[in-house]
Amino acid sequence: HPTPNKNAYAVLKFDFSGIDTSNEDRFRTSFSGKIQKAVRQFVALYRNLFPNADSFIQQLTEESPSIQSIQDAIDKAELADIKIFVIIDEYDHFANDLIAMGSQLGKNVYHNMVHANGLVRDFYEILKTGTKTVIDRIFITGISPVMLDDL
């Protein structure tokens, strides 16, 4: 039985499996790339809902850093009155990799990315802010609650 919300959301999906955790720069580049790709695919999939979608996708590719691209998409969705359902798959995959390294490097990268002003924390803060406007639902999958405690 369909719910009243059937087909009511545009789905923005992030998949954080396969992020390069070999060092902080590679992590940052890999994580940012995953965000950029997800946002571009989201806008492309729902291009009929976004005014000037093609130029917006080009702008996302050329001008917006990863975190800003999420905010830009949220802003455009708000203008177009698009409700968003966010799915985050493997939210903790990279955290588990970094912790499993068992090295000081792994601990440092984890701390720098997840704690205050870290890239991962900024990502979740933008999503949380988006819940005040167009992000109506968020579904997160992972295998352990380890990172949730640190956010």
Regions found by a protein language model. Give the residues of each.
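Phosphate-binding site recognition
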Residues: 1-151
